[in-house]
């Protein structure tokens, strides 16, 4: 597989509007990125926006190909045509935002091989779930920087890049994004997710203001398309009150299992469940503070008893009626994650054609964007390439 950490992105003349961000914002972001990387002989005028299509979100970067949430995975996602890259954010003990999918890091780093950290292994309750392992909030940034990333799904995906890349901070990701956008000659959006916000606030490490401060400190992310996402409700409401509506930063309400509750609601012993939030009345409430929803794929098109795609739900239609965009998660290129009619071969086998076919079935429902572990396949699905 080609590794593109320092290489220019493919299809450099193409960029998407994503969350319907104005052309002027894209142009400003592009010009800012080109100012940082002046060797790119391209201007906003020479690269006009294509007609709006569904935006491709690189889920944890190109995480099907490289260890997730590494700069290498983000570079690959950009090279493969992602319109946005997604860093999930957790906190260090010394108050730095770093990119990991969860604060327990034994599944995505080599922390278990470090004898100096053996006594950091512990058990905690995170959003109502007992979890054993090593947690970012028990490490300083300097300590985390001694660890290497590794593949989360070694039974499915290559481990060839294990031990090559370090954990990245949000500051590093933003700086890297500016450089990559300049090399690619196109605007690239950022879709950070606040992970376990109520938990971190409860231990004295609140995330929301630090995230906004970091984004507003960089000229690129002051104007580039940014979408902050969360499975919680309270932090999105807070961010809306802080940011208002006149901002380049949009808010995405993620939706978990309908039987479950948002982490902040659970902590407050509230009664709201995700099932309540996907009703027309619930969607109207979300529209009061967010710009879109991020449901699971099967909330949009459920599977039937045979594991095939069934009849689409009314969620996309209902969300659009409430003025919300719909950005489902997550398309993955291995058979085991696909609806039955798109599978070909053994469950653990990579199946690009099947993944593209499944994406197109969902695109037909009118979704506005989607998360994928393999942005190159997402690009094929959106652009109509075989």
Task: Mark where each language-model region is.
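Bacterial N-terminal signal peptides that target proteins for export
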Residues: 4-28
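Residue-level recognition of conserved structural "scaffold" positions that shape functional pockets
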Residues: 14, 20, 33-34, 65-68
């Amino acid at each position: 597989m080609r590794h593109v950490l320092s290489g220019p992105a493919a299809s450099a003349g193409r960029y998407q509007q994503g969350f319907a961000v104005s052309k002027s914002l894209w142009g400003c972001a592009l010009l800012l990125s080109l100012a940082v990387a002046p060797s790119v002989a391209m201007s906003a005028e020479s690269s006009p926006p294509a007609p709006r299509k569904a935006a491709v979100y690189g889920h944890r970067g190109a995480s099907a190909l490289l260890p997730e949430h590494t700069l290498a995975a983000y570079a690959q996602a950009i090279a493969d045509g992602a319109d946005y890259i997604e860093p999930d954010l957790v906190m260090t003990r010394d108050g730095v935002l770093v990119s990991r999918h969860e604060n327990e890091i034994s599944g995505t780093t080599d922390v278990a091989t470090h004898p100096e950290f053996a006594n950091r292994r512990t058990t905690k309750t995170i959003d109502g779930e007992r979890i054993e392992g090593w947690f970012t909030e028990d490490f300083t940034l300097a300590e985390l920087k001694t660890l290497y990333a590794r593949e989360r799904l070694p039974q499915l995906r290559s481990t060839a890049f294990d031990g090559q890349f370090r954990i990245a901070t949000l500051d590093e990701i933003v700086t890297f994004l500016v450089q990559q956008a300049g090399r690619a000659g196109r605007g690239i959006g950022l879709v950070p997710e606040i992970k376990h916000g109520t938990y971190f606030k409860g231990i004295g490490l609140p995330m929301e203001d630090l995230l906004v401060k970091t984004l507003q400190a960089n000229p690129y992310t002051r104007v580039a398309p940014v979408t902050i996402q969360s499975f919680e409700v309270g932090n999105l409401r807070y961010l809306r009150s802080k940011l208002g509506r006149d901002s380049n930063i949009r808010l995405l309400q993620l939706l978990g299992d309908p039987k479950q509750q948002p982490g902040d609601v659970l902590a407050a012993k509230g009664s709201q469940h995700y099932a309540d939030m996907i009703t027309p009345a619930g969607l109207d409430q979300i529209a009061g503070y967010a710009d879109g929803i991020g449901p699971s794929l099967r909330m949009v098109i459920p599977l039937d008893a045979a594991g095939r795609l069934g009849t689409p739900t009314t969620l996309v239609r209902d969300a659009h009626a409430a003025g919300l965009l719909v950005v489902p998660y997550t398309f993955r290129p291995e058979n085991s994650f696909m609806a039955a009619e798109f599978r070909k071969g053994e469950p653990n086998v990579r199946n690009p054609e099947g993944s593209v076919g499944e994406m197109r079935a969902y695109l037909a429902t009118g979704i506005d964007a989607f998360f994928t572990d393999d942005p190159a396949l997402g690009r094929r699905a959106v652009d109509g390439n075989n």
